[in-house]
Amino acid sequence: MSVKKQLERLSELGAYYHKNGWMPGTAGNLSIRIPEESGFWVSGSGLDKDLLNKRNFLYVDLESGKPVDSKNVKATKGLKPSAETSIHRAVYRALDEVGCGLHVHTLESNLICANTSKNEPIALFELPAIEILKAYGIWEENPKVYVPIIYNFPNVQDISDCLEKYLKEYRPHVPFCIIEKHGITVWGKDAVQANRNLEATDFILKYMTSWKSFSYSGEPRKLSVSDVLEQDRREIFSVEFPVYPATFY
């Protein structure tokens, strides 16, 4: 598929996500990377996602993180990259196989809290072992699957640095991360897979946050990961990130 066609597809997804309430206002951004090129395309800053077109995407050099000219599509004059461009860049720099990144601000992703901080900016928590995990290619029975949640630094570059370091050192279980009180970044080999992963992620987060309202014991059901031992974490991740029970706003 040509670059123009891929950008048109991202524009369609932007309108769909805006309608779903995943990209309210001008929040969020979408990107693709072409394997044979040295950069990636990302939606510009301050744009209504229901009105995107192929000229609303900037071509960004992967190494420098700066916008550069492209022979494929000429971006709208004066278009600027979002600060969150660095999040997409972090994923592409860490994971060679990724060809699409979707950064959205869903309500459910903002309700999940792991009490991260500047001193402990990454926590891990366990996802529920439900059927939809198969969308990520996880087929084990009752798998132990963890997702990173990252502190919402005021400077987005600090978020990106944290994410890139994590992805490079510890192979993620699932193709997404949560930025606390901010949103989620989801990725895939192309826009089709990334969109599929985002739909699965949205379902999982809706399921998780529903536990606060529906309980079989009379108390809100929260993620029970406090029993994950330090040794278990070292075996799975070889890393000393804290594992917290998730709480909900």
From Swiss-Prot:
Pathway: Amino-acid biosynthesis; L-methionine biosynthesis via salvage pathway; L-methionine from S-methyl-5-thio-alpha-D-ribose 1-phosphate: step 2/6. It catalyses: 5-(methylsulfanyl)-D-ribulose 1-phosphate = 5-methylsulfanyl-2,3-dioxopentyl phosphate + H2O. It comes from the Bacteria. GO terms for cellular component: cytoplasm. SMART domains: Aldolase_II (SM01007). It is an enzyme of class 4 (lyase). Binds 1 zinc ion per subunit. Gene3D superfamilies: Class II aldolase/adducin N-terminal domain. Its EC number is 4.2.1.109. Catalyzes the dehydration of methylthioribulose-1-phosphate (MTRu-1-P) into 2,3-diketo-5-methylthiopentyl-1-phosphate (DK-MTP-1-P). This is Methylthioribulose-1-phosphate dehydratase. It comes from Leptospira interrogans serogroup Icterohaemorrhagiae serovar copenhageni (strain Fiocruz L1-130).
